[in-house]
Amino acid sequence: MKMNHLGYATNNIEETISAFLRLGFIKVHPEIKHHVPKNMRIMRVKLGDLIIELMAPADASKPSFVGEKLKTTTEPFVLHHLCYDVDDIHKTVNDLMATGEYGIHEPITDGVFQKNQICFLRHRQIGLIEFFEWPKN
């Protein structure tokens, strides 16, 4: 396993992107991605090897993948998840689920940005963890 990115929820994605750009980060993608199924807007920024995924509700009046996390804090920006690259997502998920420490938050599905497979598990102490399996060429 290798760390891929840190996912943060924010109430104002434009202001948060600007703050990171002023700190020397660069945009990974040219535009904010609107992910309709999860009612969220996403942008990735990076500095060296560090990638931060910024997520904000697209419509605050509707349920959102990140909206519930934002309701638990008065901060405008909060850690949402950790993300790891894995070689075999099915084996990783099965092995971790067998420990009894994880629950499935979202089953294996296609990723938003790349043609990869992702899965979200919830660890009882760590919280939400995303796993990426990159396409085999």
Segments the model singles out, each with a brief description of its role:
Residues 57-59, 85-89, 134:
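Beta-hairpin (beta-strand-turn-beta-strand) motif
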Residues 1-38:
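Long, hydrophobic N-terminal alpha-helical segment
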Residues 16, 27-28, 62-63, 128-131:
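Short loop/beta submotifs within extracellular cysteine-rich repeat domains
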